[in-house]
Amino acid sequence: MSGIVSYGAYIPCHKIETGEIASVWGADGSAWAKNLNVYSKSVPGPDEDVITISVEATRLAMKRAKMDGTNIGAIYTGSESHPYAVKPTSTIVAEAIGATPNLTAADFEFACKAGTAAIQTCLGIVGNKQVENGIAIGVDTSQGAPGDALEYSASAGGGAMIIGEKNVIATINHTTSYTTDTPDFWRREGQKYPRHGGRFTGKPAFFKHVMMCGKMTMDMAGSKPEDYDYVVTHQPNGKFPIRAAKSLGFKEEQYKTGLLTPRIGNTYSGAIFLGLSAILDIAKPGDRILAIAYGSGAGSDGFDLTVTDQIAKMDRTETVEDMISRMEIINYATYAKYRGKLNMGDSK
């Protein structure tokens, strides 16, 4: 059966605390942190973008699988912050890992679930024997306008999953999707920062799609919440995923491992990849996982996974928790500099 052969993650080593952002705008940092359940967020360095993060995560996945680029037949990168409007991220990743030229590659977009759409595509081409292994990547360096609510949570990071049929560490037993035309969040071509529907992003958008997709996935698998050891959903803030998990019937011990947003913010396309990576870092053979992605616009992808004996043979050092523990706090001035929020005027 097809599934995850290996995985890798990457989180930038800088972070800014919610209180620091709030102090710049004369807001109550404690209130913002409590309301969002986000206390700090990752910040990419000036030399980091979706490409560099994708390469780092992919190299870790390749290292764990003890593979080289010749084993990879497809690379698909999902993101809403690709550095180029016309120039694929995936071809650069392919070159960096030595996978060119005998492979297929493409960049995916579907807001925060672009990466899980890439997983589904890899499952398809691996399943019909077009390629032996494909890499699905979910990474973002998300944007939040200065002073906007998004600035408190929009962060950076992501992961890569090698999908194949040999030496699988977690089988993907079932996958399904729930998709509608729901304009909860958008950014037009040329706009630097996205716009959102405020409270409209909750009940009719995130919750409707995640809840329906979660129920559909469990119906397809013939499972119940108590059949799973772990659950991870998309994490636009620290409260929505907890509410969604509880509404679906899950308990804290099932969702707490994959819940990273309170410490690193919303990594958009990277959220499910990082949450799932944190789970795989500690999972045991036989553990069962439910993963539910969400992307604005809107849709959800659901996955039912079972961890195999193969995971015990994998080197799982360089964990997500290791990456979080090494993060260093920066101030708002440094954050603004790194994120290009400073208007330098006419440089001439």
Where are the regions a protein language model picked out?
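Condensing-enzyme catalytic core mediating Claisen C-C bond formation in acyl metabolism
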Residues: 1-47, 148-204, 208, 294-297, ...
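Short coil/turn connectors at secondary-structure junctions
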Residues: 1-2, 69-73, 100-103, 128-134, ...
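Buried hydrophobic positions in well-ordered alpha/beta secondary-structure cores of metabolic enzymes
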Residues: 4-6, 61, 72-75, 93, ...
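Acidic, glycine-rich active-site loops and adjacent beta-strand->loop/helix elements
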Residues: 10, 78-83, 110-115, 138-143, ...
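Conserved catalytic cysteine-centered active-site region
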Residues: 30-51, 80-133, 243-275
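Phosphate/pyrophosphate-binding loops at sites that engage ATP/ADP/AMP, CoA/4′-phosphopantetheine
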Residues: 57-73, 211-227, 248, 282-283
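Short glycine-rich or small-residue beta-strand-to-loop segments that form or flank ligand, phosphate
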Residues: 73-81, 107, 231-232
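Flexible, glycine-rich active-site loops centered on histidine and acidic residues
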Residues: 127-159
